[in-house]
């Protein structure tokens, strides 16, 4: 349909519609739209229909908005306004690629429209279409050469494309246009200079960067950044004496910064260990109270010199009462010789302080206060916990608690000892004791909630967190709103451990949504940062967003989700009782009766709580409805509700797992787990070439990894057993597998692996699993391989032994209940505190509430009687 042009009166109304939209006066805008469209001549005016649709979209009427905009577009396909509006609609729904197409169509009919070009550039940088972004910024520079955003945007485009020299030239041309007095302090100009210097450094133009820094030093506000950059540049240019002077100046500003000492070392280039130590001895004299110059030499010293320096360092810290001293020295624990020296010294302090209140009986000087002994015992508890001796660690921490029962740090360490020893319930109880000593401390509150979650006590953790969340809303909703991902990852892990897969997946998807929101949140900064000239931070933000899903929170959530989806594929939940059946199948009559009693009590308690919560929920929903509506309008519509039951009964669990896997394959390639999870998914999908690809990538990272060995055997065996593979696929597989396995068969390959790693328990477990996988008649040998607890084995730790017990129980080594019970008893002697190895009759009779209350489950006892 040909475009209809509006007469002056209606044209004036149309301009008022645009103004109303810009000022968010949507109701008024709709009135003016109605005035134009009510005239039969203009009832199908494309641009007015499009603007009406855009206005309705802002009021949350999405379907009607799309219908009107499309109708308007059909009536006027050559209108840049209609295409622009359609692009804005797509952008509001986060359909950025579609929005870019719309903007490009709009520019066909009005190629120099500034607003469309600006909107297009925002989407291009959001989607990292850097070539397109550069072209668009060039057009904007040509149209508005007087605007600084035009120059800066064009320079950033070249910077992101790694054409540093061109970016530096553009910035220099722009800088020349800035009229700034040398004596005037201008923050924005200062940031521009620092950004220009960053570009020069990234271009490798170190001499020019140093000259630039010296020329404009007075006009840069961030003096610390100037000095730090100057030090780096002088090192790059091998002007070592000047660099040393700069780093000495930086040390005076902050004697506690490790990087300045490293920089000074690089500048002075000590020839041997004594010269290196001399650098730090000079710093001791200059900064007698500084801990960093006393700590850093411990990294490279050894023998008597190490002992001498460590002695001085520890005495200073223990006398002052410095709680984090163990964390400061933790990195030294990789060296067994240094660990022995630490133990010798600190045990000696404890003995001497008990007898004569001195660090050494031969010392001359005043006696140490009683708190010094306390901090020595506090350190020793952490030391023995670190080296895997929880009984001795508990002796020291209990002695310390007896002497000072009000010090929170002692309870924190006691909780950690129990956690590392495998008794998370006892750990949670002691962390709760710590929290009860200071209920206003948010750190302790969060720590306690985390431990309670690790004990699978989700309700108690929510109660704990509710002390620091907004009133009037549930703690879980508020924590989700605040993107509190540590809580959600721990929740997901707890739900997974309890076989509540739907709830666990809900938490994983919530975390996934947080990362999507963080990615979308950068949109506002594309204009803000150019306006405020915070260019260094802006470029850092863009680089961070590109690798956002490398974050441990995302990796942990993705790992949990993938593991659950794999379980759901192997054992789909077809009805509500399936999980329950899996838990009760192997129970005795007595255990079953006990479980039923517990369930009845839980049901009764849940009903009472449900009634109490219903009234509270209604109030919360009323409070949140308006906020939720506002949020939905802002983010482009309500999100699909995450329903646990629906998530747990998904039809294509492997496809859902791939959604979590894809970002890991792109961004976390250096972690072997990424490729092994990929193998597990493709193995179930019978995608042989993708299985091979995953194995090869994992092999390149760690060819001796136990889990990788299992994957390789399963791949090898599957290829050998498969008869209906296409010839081309079989040819590729044969060629690549010859490189991986050589001329052998799966059984021989497994035996070779076992011989090569016979002294490693994790490797023995993997080999044992594959012995049974390849030949179920070899079960006895497989169990013997896995259950050996010889003291000479490496990695014979709590985690590995728990994995062996799990393999004995889950069928990986066949049906072997007697072997599992015997192994549990053996491990109980090795790890007496670990819950996983407690005797079958063992029950944790205490339940954790908030603020240290503990009570016996008397009702359960009554029912038993």
Swiss-Prot record:
Each TPR repeat, start to end: 46-79, 80-113, 148-184, 224-257, 374-407, 409-441, 485-518, 672-705, 799-834
InterPro entries: NatA_aux_su, TPR-like_helical_dom_sf, TPR_rpt
One Pfam family in the UniProt entry: NatA_aux_su
Induction comment from the UniProt entry of this chain: Regulated by NMDA receptor.
Modified-residue entries (N6-acetyllysine), positions: 262, 734, 755
Keywords assigned by UniProt, alphabetized: Acetylation, Angiogenesis, Cytoplasm, Developmental protein, Differentiation, Nucleus, Phosphoprotein, Repeat, TPR repeat, Transcription, Transcription regulation
Tissue expression: Endothelial cells, osteoblasts and myeloid cells of the hematopoietic tissue. Present in adult ovary, bone marrow, brain, heart, kidney, testis and osteoblasts.
Protein name: N-alpha-acetyltransferase 15, NatA auxiliary subunit
Organism: Mus musculus
């Amino acid at each position: 349909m040909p475009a209809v042009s509006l007469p002056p009166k209606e044209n004036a109304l149309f301009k008022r519609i645009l103004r109303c939209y810009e000022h968010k006066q949507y109701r008024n805008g709709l009135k003016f739209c109605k005035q134009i469209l009510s005239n039969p001549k203009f009832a199908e005016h494309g641009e007015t229909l499009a603007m009406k649709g855009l206005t309705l979209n802002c009021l949350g009427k999405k379907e009607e908005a799309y219908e009107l905009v499309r109708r308007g577009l059909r009536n006027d396909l050559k209108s840049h306004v209609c295409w622009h509006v359609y692009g804005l609609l797509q952008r509001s729904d986060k359909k950025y690629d579609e929005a870019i197409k719309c903007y490009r169509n709009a520019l066909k009919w009005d190629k120099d429209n500034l607003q469309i070009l600006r909107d297009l550039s925002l989407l291009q940088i959001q989607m990292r279409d850097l070539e397109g972004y550069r072209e668009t910024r060039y057009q904007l520079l040509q149209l508005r050469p007087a605007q600084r955003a035009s120059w800066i945007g064009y320079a950033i485009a070249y910077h992101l494309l790694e054409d540093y020299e061109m970016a530096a030239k553009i910035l220099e041309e722009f800088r020349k246009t800035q009229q700034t007095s040398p004596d005037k302090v201008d923050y924005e100009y200062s940031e521009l200079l620092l950004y220009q210097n960053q570009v020069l450094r990234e271009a490798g133009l170190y001499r020019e960067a140093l000259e630039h820094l010296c020329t404009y030093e007075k006009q840069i506000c961030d003096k610390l950044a100037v000095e730090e950059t100057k030090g780096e540049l002088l090192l790059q240019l091998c002007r070592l004496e000047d660099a040393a002077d700069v780093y000495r100046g930086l040390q005076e500003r902050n004697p506690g910064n490790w990087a300045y000492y490293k920089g000074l070392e690089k500048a002075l280039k000590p020839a041997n260990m004594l010269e290196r130590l001399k650098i730090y001895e000079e710093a001791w004299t200059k900064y007698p109270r500084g801990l960093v110059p006393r700590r850093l030499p411990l990294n490279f010293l050894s023998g008597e010199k190490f002992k001498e320096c460590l002695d001085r360092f520890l005495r200073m810290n223990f006398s002052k009462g410095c709680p984090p001293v163990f964390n400061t020295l933790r990195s030294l624990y990789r060296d067994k010789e240094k660990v022995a020296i630490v133990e010798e010294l600190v045990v000696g302090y404890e003995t001497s302080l008990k007898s004569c209140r001195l660090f050494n009986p031969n010392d001359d000087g005043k006696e140490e206060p009683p708190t010094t002994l306390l901090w020595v015992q506090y350190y020793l508890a952490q030391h023995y916990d670190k080296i895997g001796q929880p009984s001795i660690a508990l002796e020291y921490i209990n002695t310390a608690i007896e002497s000072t029962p009000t010090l929170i740090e002692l309870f924190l360490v006691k909780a950690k000892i129990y956690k590392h020893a495998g008794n998370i319930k006892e750990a949670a109880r002691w962390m709760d004791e710590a929290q009860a000593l200071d209920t206003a401390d948010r750190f302790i509150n969060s720590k306690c909630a985390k431990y309670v979650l690790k004990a699978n006590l989700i309700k108690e953790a929510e109660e704990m967190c509710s002390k620091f969340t907004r009133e009037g809303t549930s703690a879980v909703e508020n924590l989700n709103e605040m993107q509190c991902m540590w809580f959600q990852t721990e929740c997901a892990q707890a739900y997974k451990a309890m076989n509540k897969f739907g709830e666990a997946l809900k938490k994983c998807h919530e975390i996934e949504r947080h990362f999507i929101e963080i990615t979308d949140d950068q949109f506002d900064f594309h204009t803000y940062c150019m306006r405020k000239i915070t260019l260094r931070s802006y470029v850092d933000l863009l680089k961070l967003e590109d690798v956002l899903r490398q974050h441990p929170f995302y990796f942990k959530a993705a790992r949990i989700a993938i593991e659950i989806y794999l379980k759901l594929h192997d054992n789909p939940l077809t009805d509500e009782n399936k999980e329950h059946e899996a838990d009760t199948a192997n129970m005795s009559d007595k255990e079953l009766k006990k479980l039923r009693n517990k369930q009845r009590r839980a049901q009764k308690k849940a009903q009472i709580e449900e009634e109490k919560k219903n009234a509270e929920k209604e109030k919360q929903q009323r409070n949140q409805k308006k906020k939720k509506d506002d949020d939905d309008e802002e983010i482009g519509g309500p999100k699909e509700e995450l329903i646990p039951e629906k998530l747990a009964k998904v039809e294509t669990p492997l496809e859902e797992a791939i959604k979590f896997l894809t970002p890991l394959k792109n961004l976390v390639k250096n972690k072997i787990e990424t490729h092994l999870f990929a193998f597990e998914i493709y193995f179930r999908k019978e995608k042989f070439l993708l299985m091979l690809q995953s194995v090869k990538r994992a092999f390149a990272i760690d060819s001796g990894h136990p889990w990788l060995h299992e994957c390789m055997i399963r791949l090898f065996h599957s290829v050998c057993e498969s008869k209906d593979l296409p010839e081309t696929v079989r040819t590729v597989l044969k060629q690549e597998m010859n490189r991986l396995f050589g001329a052998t068969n799966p059984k021989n390959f497994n035996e070779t692996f076992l011989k090569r790693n016979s002294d490693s328990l994790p490797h023995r477990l993997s080999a044992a699993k594959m012995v049974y996988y390849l030949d179920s008649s070899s079960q006895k040998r497989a169990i013997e391989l896995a259950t050996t607890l010889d003291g000479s084995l490496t990695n014979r730790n709590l985690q590995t032994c728990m994995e062996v017990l799990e393999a004995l129980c889950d069928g990986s080594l066949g049906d072997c209940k007697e072997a599992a019970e015997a192994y549990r008893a053996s491990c109980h002697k090795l790890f007496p505190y670990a819950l996983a190895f407690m005797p079958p009759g063992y029950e944790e009779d205490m339940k954790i509430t908030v603020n240290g209350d503990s009570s016996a489950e008397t009702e359960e006892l009554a029912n038993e009687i």
